[in-house]
Amino acid sequence: AVSKKHTILASDVFMVLFLIAGFFAFLAAKDRMAAFTGELGRRCGFAFLLLVGAAYICVAVGCSVKEWIYPVFACVSGLTYLMSILQHLEIDLFHLYASIRFDQRSMFISTFGNINIYASFLCLTIPLFMAAGMYADKCWKRVLYTVVLFFGEMAVIAANSDVAYIGIGVPMVVLLLAGIRNRVKTYDDRMVIGQKSACDPFLGWLIGCAGIVLGYTVMAFLTTGTGKGYDKLTGLAKLVDHRLILTIVSIVLVIGSLLYGWGSRKKADCVVAPKKASKSVRDKKRTTGCWKIIFWSVVGILILTAFVTVVTGANNQWEIFTFDDEWGNYRGYVWNRLFRIYQDLPFVNKVFGAGNESIYTLMSARYSDEMIEVTGTVYDSAHNEYLQYLVTMGIVGLITYLGLIISSVVNGVKLVKKDPLCMPLLAGMIGYVVQAFVNVEQPITTPFLFLFLALMAGMRRRS
């Protein structure tokens, strides 16, 4: 018999193919040394791919997820949240801003540097802790995750990056649907996600969401009340001006969590137990039907809301739906020019890419003067990881990367029904792949993605 430890998963195959695609991109590069080191970009050249590939293999084969990992990670992440909050309120404990020009300080935060990189970290960790709280097996863990989520959402305002709202919002919706779906499964007396949890995951979602909104509300009052950090806020961070709405939502979520928790306290529905004789088949069917209606109603409302938002925004020419060169802080300009560059590449480069971290070379060679005139800067990244891989590693690189992501999602979905420890990794991964549509790959938070993928592969292999 073949040991499960040595079972080859689809995600393993795609990881190897992704590394091979990176090697061919390295061969296709005009400056191979720059392609290897990534020195003309964000230091994510072929050497970086080799490192994350080696880490993936080691972790996927030899490591496993322990229950203590998430609480420790929560404490460490909480410190980075706290530092960003203090810096936002102009309290620089370690004088990290001393060597940064005053007009550039708003672009740097916490221990991560650029605000978009810190936002990427928030997109990884906040959904992770949300899921960890939903499926926590002890009350003290749920309290810890809720407190960390409270500070994490305060840090979202400090980050002042719209990326965070996108990367956190989508996993939150996914976790909401997972929590509701869990209730349907529970009343059907089937195996449920988080069957080892101390509490109902849907209740965990309510508590976590209450902590998040409450943290955002408190930070909004601190920012507007003291005036510190307010002037630099842009985009969605201007939600701090709507303090009354935030307060009402916070109160509703807190009261709703208390009422729901009190109502389900004696039911212990989160644990799959033998059928209770006192509960008739009719009652079970009725309850299951109610939760199914709630589930599909939420799905319908989300789809309808998205449709109405897009139609209304397009008709009223909202900035986010007006794609021009200035869209997304000039992301529209970069994407448009990179698509033109890709279309004009030789066939071999379309397949295998123009070389790892070659965006700076390509943009400078063709649009140097225009880029400076329009945007005022020189771009070395596509600010979209998928477009970045398409141009630098070709269609082969993009397909293998997407295959790695999709196969890892499949690993997580199959595993999460048996082991709730996988759900936080899956939620964090979703947060990252969503924010990657408008953010950059870099050697600070991108390795977390490959770590999560490797951990899920290892858990899947051992299951």
Model segments located where?
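Hydrophobic transmembrane alpha-helices and their immediate junctions
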Residues: 142, 393-424
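Membrane-interfacial helix-loop-helix modules of multi-pass inner-membrane proteins that assemble, modify
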Residues: 26-37, 79-120, 150-157, 165-166, ...
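Membrane helix-loop boundary segments at the extracytoplasmic
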Residues: 388-393, 423-453
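Transmembrane signal-anchor hairpin modules in multi-pass inner-membrane enzymes, especially those
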Residues: 1-50, 54-75, 132-146, 168-295, ...
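Loop-to-helix entry and N-terminal half of a specific, functionally important transmembrane alpha helix
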Residues: 77, 144-150, 193-197, 380, ...
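Aromatic-rich transmembrane-lumenal/periplasmic boundary elements in polytopic membrane proteins
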Residues: 42-43, 83-98, 308-358
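TM-adjacent membrane-interface loops and short helices in multi-pass inner/ER membrane proteins
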Residues: 114, 330-379, 393-399
